[in-house]
C-alpha cells in the first residue's frame, strides 16, 4: 500500500514542501530564519485574534480597552506583550533573513526575492497600523506624522491624506479603518508567504557557496525539521525572556499616556525597527525628497539582482564585498541610532552622511567592487 503522505492530494503538497523536499546538505543556521518568520507570523495571528476579541476601535475606549486586556482579561497581559514583542522578534528575523539573502546572493532568484520585498512592505504597513491601535500619545502622533507625509505627493497629496484619515485629522474613522486593515493584512501576508514558498520550491534553496547543489541533496525531514525545531526553541526562549522580564524594553513610555491632539510629545519617533527608515526620511530637508528616500530605502532591494556584477553568486569567497556588506550593516545600525535622536547638531549631519553612504554602497560601491573581484580572479 502506498504511504498516505505520497498518495493523498493534500498530504502530497505537505510532503513535497516539508518532508521529502530535496534540500542542500550544507545550508547553515542563516537559513533558519524563514521558518522562524513563519513561527512569528503564527504567534502574531493567534495572539492578535485573542486581542481583537477584547479590543474596541473607538477613540474614547481604545486606550482603556488595552488597559482592560492587561488588567482584567485572563492572561491578557501576556497575550498583549507576546503580540507587541512578537513584532520586534518578527523584524529581527526579517532583517537577518534579508541580510542573509544579500550576503549569499539569494536575490538572483528574482521572483522569490520580489515577493519577499512585497512581504517586507506588507509587514511594515501592518506593524505601523498596529502601533496606532493602543491610542497612546506616540500612536496618535506617529499616525499623524507618517500619514501626513503623503501630502507631499503633488496635486493629489492633500486629498489623499484626508481620504486616508476619513476626515480633517487623525480621529475615530482613522482608528477604525486602521484596525480593519491591521486585522486583514496578516492573512494577506500568509497568502503571499505561500507564493514566496511556491517560487522558492521552483528553484530550490540557495546555499552558502552559491554553487548549484543538485548533485548533493538531502531530505528536509528529519535533518532540517530538527534544525528548525532548535531555532524555534531559541526564538521562543528569547521572546518569553523579553515578555516576562522586561516587556516594555522596546516600547515608548509616551504610549502609556492617552492620545491628546492638543499636546505634542517632545520627540516623535516610531518603533525601533522603523528608525533606520525614519532617519533617512529626516536626513533630506525637502518633504517630497524625504518621502521618496523613505520608500527607496526598501524598494532599492528590488534593483539588487540588476546590480549583481560578480561572476560568483555568494560573498563567501569575495573578501572585499564582505567588508562592504559589514559596512552596510554598521551603517544601518548608525541610522537606527540616529532615528531615535533629536533633530539637532551633530545628529543631523551624521544622519545625512549615513543616508548617503547607504545608497552609495548599494548602488555604486558594491557593484564596482564585484567587477574588481572579477578582475582579481584572473591573477
Curated annotation (Swiss-Prot):
Heme 1 (or BL or b562) is low-potential and absorbs at about 562 nm, and heme 2 (or BH or b566) is high-potential and absorbs at about 566 nm. Heme b b562 binds at residues 83, 182. It comes from Ochotona thibetana (Moupin pika). The chain crosses the membrane at residues 33-53, 77-98, 113-133, 178-198, 226-246, 288-308, 320-340, 347-367. PANTHER family: CYTOCHROME B. This is Cytochrome b. The cytochrome bc1 complex contains 11 subunits: 3 respiratory subunits (MT-CYB, CYC1 and UQCRFS1), 2 core proteins (UQCRC1 and UQCRC2) and 6 low-molecular weight proteins (UQCRH/QCR6, UQCRB/QCR7, UQCRQ/QCR8, UQCR10/QCR9, UQCR11/QCR10 and a cleavage product of UQCRFS1). This cytochrome bc1 complex then forms a dimer. InterPro entries: Cyt_b/b6_C, Cyt_b/b6_C_sf, Cyt_b/b6_N, Cytb/b6-like_sf, Cytochrome_b, Cytochrome_b_C_euk/bac, Cytochrome_b_N_euk/bac, Di-haem_cyt_TM. It is found in: Mitochondrion inner membrane. Its main location: mitochondrion. Disulfide bonds: none annotated. The lineage of its organism: Eukaryota, Metazoa, Chordata, Craniata, Vertebrata. It comes from the Eukaryota. One of its GO terms (cellular component) is respiratory chain complex III. Belongs to the cytochrome b family. It is a multi-pass membrane protein. PROSITE patterns: CYTB_CTER, CYTB_NTER. It holds the Pfam family Cytochrom_B_C. Component of the ubiquinol-cytochrome c reductase complex (complex III or cytochrome b-c1 complex) that is part of the mitochondrial respiratory chain. The b-c1 complex mediates electron transfer from ubiquinol to cytochrome c. Contributes to the generation of a proton gradient across the mitochondrial membrane that is then used for ATP synthesis.
Amino acid at each position: 500500500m502506498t504511504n498516505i503522505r505520497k498518495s493523498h492530494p493534500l498530504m502530497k503538497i505537505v510532503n513535497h514542501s516539508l518532508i521529502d523536499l530535496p534540500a542542500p546538505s550544507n545550508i547553515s543556521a542563516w537559513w533558519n530564519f524563514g521558518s522562524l518568520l513563519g513561527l512569528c507570523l503564527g504567534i502574531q495571528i493567534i495572539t492578535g485574534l485573542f486581542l481583537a476579541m477584547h479590543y474596541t476601535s473607538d477613540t474614547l475606549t481604545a486606550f482603556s480597552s488595552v488597559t482592560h486586556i492587561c488588567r482584567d482579561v485572563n492572561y491578557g497581559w501576556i497575550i498583549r506583550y507576546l503580540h507587541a514583542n512578537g513584532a520586534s522578534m518578527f523584524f529581527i528575523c526579517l532583517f537577518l533573513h534579508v541580510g542573509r539573502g544579500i550576503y549569499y546572493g539569494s536575490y538572483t532568484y528574482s521572483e522569490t526575492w520580489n515577493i519577499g520585498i512585497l512581504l517586507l512592505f506588507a509587514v511594515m504597513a501592518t506593524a505601523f497600523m498596529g502601533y496606532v491601535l493602543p491610542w497612546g500619545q506616540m500612536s496618535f502622533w506617529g499616525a499623524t506624522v507618517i500619514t501626513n507625509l503623503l501630502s507631499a505627493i503633488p496635486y493629489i497629496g492633500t486629498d489623499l491624506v484626508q481620504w486616508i484619515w476619513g476626515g480633517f485629522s487623525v480621529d475615530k474613522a482613522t482608528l477604525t479603518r486602521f484596525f480593519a486593515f491591521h486585522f486583514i493584512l496578516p492573512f494577506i501576508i500568509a497568502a503571499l508567504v505561500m507564493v514566496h514558498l511556491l517560487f522558492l520550491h521552483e528553484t530550490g534553496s540557495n546555499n552558502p557557496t552559491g554553487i548549484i547543489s543538485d548533485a548533493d541533496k538531502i531530505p528536509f525531514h528529519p535533518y532540517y525539521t530538527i534544525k528548525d525545531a532548535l531555532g524555534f526553541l531559541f526564538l521562543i526562549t528569547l521572546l518569553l525572556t523579553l515578555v516576562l522580564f522586561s516587556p516594555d524594553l522596546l516600547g515608548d513610555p509616551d504610549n502609556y499616556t492617552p492620545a491628546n491632539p492638543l499636546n505634542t510629545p517632545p520627540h516623535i519617533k516610531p518603533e525601533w525597527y522603523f528608525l533606520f527608515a525614519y532617519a533617512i526620511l529626516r536626513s533630506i530637508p525637502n518633504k517630497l525628497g524625504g518621502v521618496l528616500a523613505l520608500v527607496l530605502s526598501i524598494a532599492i532591494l528590488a534593483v539588487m539582482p540588476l546590480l549583481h556584477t560578480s561572476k560568483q553568486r555568494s560573498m563567501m569567497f569575495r573578501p572585499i564585498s564582505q567588508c562592504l556588506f559589514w559596512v552596510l550593516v554598521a551603517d544601518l545600525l548608525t541610522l537606527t541610532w540616529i532615528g531615535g535622536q533629536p533633530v539637532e547638531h551633530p545628529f543631523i549631519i551624521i544622519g545625512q552622511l549615513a543616508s548617503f553612504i547607504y545608497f552609495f554602497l548599494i548602488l555604486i560601491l558594491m557593484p564596482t567592487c564585484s567587477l574588481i573581484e572579477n578582475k582579481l580572479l584572473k591573477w
